[in-house]
Amino acid sequence: MSTHQCQFNKLNTVVCQYHKVFCLYQCCQCKKYHICDGSKTCILINTGESLVCTLTGNCIFNNFQENTFLKQDNIKESKQQFDFTLFANILESLKQDLENYFIKSYGLEEVSKAILDNNSLKPEICDLIRCTFQHCCHIFGEIQYGYDIICSMYIHIIISIYSTRTVYGNLLFKCTKNKKYDYILKRMRETWMSTLITGDSCQDQIKS
């Protein structure tokens, strides 16, 4: 029996908005709650510029040095070599959001057929997401809406590769207006395409 791994999504209910609660997350499977405020229940990674909770992808503090109340035992130092295990929960949430996007979006049937099998991402697509993620994971520590930017990047890449016509929506352009993110997007697309063409395994490119 496999161990359950929570996939947290931010709660954006009327009650949360009214009371201005923006740090409450809930697992989409077991319905467990997580308060993502930098406390000891968070699993934090020090990116060098900020602290990011690996359970949710939420940027806790842009300047963590000013927040001395944080317990050091729940902070992991960012490593030069990409460590997939630190972002496992975020990757699972990303894949689920991509599935939902392409299932619900009209006019993308061609793309959905290429990347989905029974409403789930095909294994080879999951592998490609996994091996390109190392190029963009640092965005979580740079901006509060890093997760949205990364989702936008993957939607852009997938549509540009698997669609025979231009069907971009407004969501896609938030990652191309910034030259820095546009450069990251191009690197991710190049890695995606080169892996498809050469058939190389993504396992050789990242630390499992």
UniProtKB/Swiss-Prot annotation:
A Pfam family the protein falls into: Herpes_UL92
Q: Give the source species.
A: Saimiriine herpesvirus 2 (strain 11) (SaHV-2)
Concerning InterPro entries, the annotation shows: Herpes_UL92
Under what name is this protein listed? Gene 31 protein
Family the UniProt entry places it in: Belongs to the herpesviridae UL92 family.
Q: Which top-level group of life is the source organism from?
A: Viruses
Taxonomic lineage from the root: Viruses, Duplodnaviria, Heunggongvirae, Peploviricota, Herviviricetes
